Amino acid sequence: MILNLHPLENLKSYISSRPPLVIFMVSVSGMAIAFLTLGYFFKMKEIKSPGMTEDWNIFLLRFNNLDLCVSENETLKHFLNETTPPESTVTSGQARSSTQTPQALEDSGPINISVAITLTLDPLKPFGGYSRNITHLSSTIFGHQIGLSGRDSHEEMNITFTLPAAWNSDDCIVHGHCEQVVFTTCMTVTAVTNVFPVTVQPPHCIPETYSNASLWYKIYTTARDSGTKNAQDYNPFWCYKGAIGKVYHALNPKLTVIVPEDDRSLINLHLMDTSYFLFVMVITMFCYAVIRGRPSKLRQSKSEFLPEKVALSDA
């Protein structure tokens, strides 16, 4: 018995007789391609972990919204180049282990964490600088000023910037005015443990050895968050005769929490298996359409209306 197949005719008749099934095949094919592409994406790209809402990149970027005012009216505090952390705080080295067990140290008091960060000081025209060597800038803020929410929004945070070199009025005298300066400072944040992220920390700096000045002078600054600029009680003379400081943190890819490679491989495997199954389903339906063609019921119904059949029935 010879089987005569007409694949193109069968395929055309299959498409014309079963359009819903054809649409289903196209949809399944699209899903298979989408799963295959998504699986390749998970395999080749590093994906940020959706379960970790805040890492150190996000935390340090919050300080970019702060404006620090260094005013001429502030008093200087002089101290020698020999400082030790207070007994009530934990040093930055101890803070590394504290982030791993935040519940155990939640009530242990504030801790110090020191990281390197960029600070720009933009003096306004009336600002004449300081005759003393300024090596430290300090400020006190609350969590809501950097966008923290919930209980953390009411937490008090002390920030101290240790400059690598002294900042004074010598350059102001040379140029006739004070120009903008950019420092890579050692920023020390003192706050309770629950304020800090529990992810991998950035490299720590040591404020006690960061500055090369022998005589240190600390000046206290006032901080203003970005939301205050749009408030009705905004004061345009907020930092008159002063210098405005801005913090800038450059994104560090090593601080972003990503999905582990094993998990990404498992996700890729599941997506690949699903796409292969869908492809097999589509290929099976396509082969059936090529071989079977138009449904048998339709062929029988048409054959009943052939002229020969009608003539025989009349006879």
From Swiss-Prot:
Can you say where in the cell this protein is located? Membrane
Residue spans with biased composition (Polar residues)? 82-103
> Which is an annotated Pfam family here?
TMEM219
Q: Where is this region: Disordered?
A: 82-106
Q: Which GO terms describe its cellular component?
A: membrane
Q: Transmembrane segments in this chain: where?
A: 22-42, 180-200, 271-291
Chief place where the protein resides: membrane
What protein family does this chain belong to? Belongs to the TMEM248 family.
The name on file for this protein is Transmembrane protein 248
Origin organism is Xenopus laevis (African clawed frog)
